[in-house]
Amino acid sequence: MADPQPRSDSPSGQSAVSHDEDEGSVLGTGLTTRHIEAFGRKVTTTASHLMAPKSDPTLTTHYQSAMSDIQRELRRPTVQRKVFSFAQTTPTDLVRSKLSTSEIQYRALSALPDELLANIPEDTSTYSLFQGFQASMPEDDNEHRKSHRRRRSHGQKLLEDSGKSSRPLPQTVGSLKRERDVLNRRLEMMGIRKNMCSAEIHEIDNKIANLNNMRKIVLDRLAGLEMDEAELEHELVQLDNRLEDMEEAMEESATLISTPKAVDDEVTLDSENQAMDASFMSESIYEKIPSPKAWKHKSLRKRSMPILHEHFEPGSMIRELQAHNDMITAMDFDVPFGTMVSSALDDTVRVWDLNLGRCMGFLEGHHASVRCLQVENNIVATGSMDASIRLWDLSRASYAPRDNRITRDDEEDDDDALGYEDPSAEPPPPPPSSMEDCPLFSLEAHVDEVTALHFRGDTLISGSADKTLRQWDLVKGRCVQTLDVLWAAAQASSIMGGGDSQWRPTGRLPDASADFVGALQCFDAALACGTADGMIRLWDLRSGQVHRSLVGHTGPITCLQFDDVHLITGSLDRSIRIWDLRTGSIYDAYAYDHPITSMMFDTRRIVAAAGEDVVKVYDKTDGRHWDCGAGVTAEEEGITPAIVERVRIKDGYLTEGRKDGTIGIWTC
């Protein structure tokens, strides 16, 4: 009896079973090597039929026409782009997708290479990119506010009418849940927006830090350029001086060659007679005529103005110098980062290079402390307690801005160093020969100490404790006019009918240490002078008379300065007053807690020394008062700066001198 299901041992049966298993493996696990080989044989067979020669009788023309159509289709750009998109997909994906066009296009567009995925930075954000996108979408806040107001007003109305109305609430549980979900969603969006704002703030802070670093680099570059400019200008001045000396020497030699000997003898006799006359005239101190060097006023202008300090924050310290060993009595400088001259009660007058903070040398010649000085371009005028006035030409100083220590001899003494590293140490003496060619001449006619001076052009005005003002001609080197302040006060009181009192101090408490002439300034024929009686007198140098007196201070005048419209004065009565020169009235006034010892202004600010360890600054543009100096951060740093005695400001570049001999340089 035969079996209902006979077992077949034929190869065809085995191949059928294995074929089913292989097909299952293809669908389940993917391609195998056997399937790839079978697919290759089929492709080879098909290609052999397609590429057979035309002489083959078994070949039909259908294959030839089909290949031509396929070639035309493949040349289309759309088909080529599809082929390239296929190339980005693995064969396994092609088989799994069963060559579906839509799926292949989706995979080609959405697939990202591993290189791009590896470059994605790690993010610690608690929200996703899609949530951030949703949070960045604008919302209608007005509708939300209106609905919130409606709910609040309706709730209040329900509370008010709870006893009158018993109708049920219109909201259902579902609507309340939906409203709660909406509010939770809004709250979630609010949190995401807060995180986004915080991230933006951190990003802005990083950008600001990077910009500050870039700004610092550019500032260092600007400082180097200005230093190079200063060196070049110094070399130009030296070359101009050498050229001028050579021209003078050539003129003198030509004059000596062309002048006969007899004429030289007559000139010698005349010079001897003039010398004898000068010796007789020197007995009268009011008509002493010095024999100075030839005065040649040169209006030197700097070709470039420093602008580095304009890029600092106001109140920033640029440098601090331990300039002297005693209280600063006077100081002045020409331009920011230029040349400064300072004097103190240690009987020294020092010249400083503000660009490097180094001492250039000493101005020696006075026999006592210098009380007042002025720097104008390369000319310096100093007034001393020895009753003399001396003028100096700093362009003749032998000073190298950058002293190359490598090129110096080893046996050279280091006592002539121009700088010092320890600010607390005593400043070392600069080279003794650096300023030996700077003195021009001396003006000696006062009989008491010189307390104030000012020069402009070829005219210098000086005020002394001998109660006189003197006008000097710098070309001839002699006094051309003497103004008696007491006589002028007496004349003014007699004209105004002031009785028999000729000098009437207006101060509440007389100060014996106050200077009789506290400050003065001249411009052409106009002179403003402040004295110990608290009066500001405006003189006309052409007539030698006082044409106006400004009354208002109750203490000695210590400082003044005027421009085209206003005159600003400071006094020991602790006030600073701004006068209108057109009307003679007070335009503005303000006061401090201590007497004013020094004051100066530029186009924007008025700075004053008012008996404190800071400089008092008044901003004229916005009327703001603020402090500048070492005393601002004294408590934080644990230091006790000395009292500020003298201040100078030009173009926002502030210098202040203190009682301990320290000079601070600030931006203002």
UniProtKB/Swiss-Prot annotation:
Feature: compositional bias, Polar residues: 7-17
Disordered: region residues: 1-32, 137-178, 403-438
Source taxonomy: Eukaryota, Fungi, Dikarya, Ascomycota, Pezizomycotina
Cross-referenced Pfam families: WD40
Coiled coil: 193-259
Protein family: Belongs to the WD repeat MDV1/CAF4 family.
Membrane topology: Peripheral membrane protein
Function: Involved in mitochondrial fission. Acts as an adapter protein required to form mitochondrial fission complexes. Formation of these complexes is required to promote constriction and fission of the mitochondrial compartment at a late step in mitochondrial division.
InterPro entries in UniProt: G-protein_beta_WD-40_rep, WD40/YVTN_repeat-like_dom_sf, WD40_repeat_CS, WD40_repeat_dom_sf, WD40_rpt
Species of origin: Coccidioides immitis (strain RS) (Valley fever fungus)
Protein name listed in UniProt: Mitochondrial division protein 1
Ranges occupied by WD repeats: 323-364, 365-402, 445-484, 490-549, 552-591, 593-628, 634-668
Protein location: Mitochondrion outer membrane
Segments of skewed composition (Acidic residues): 409-419
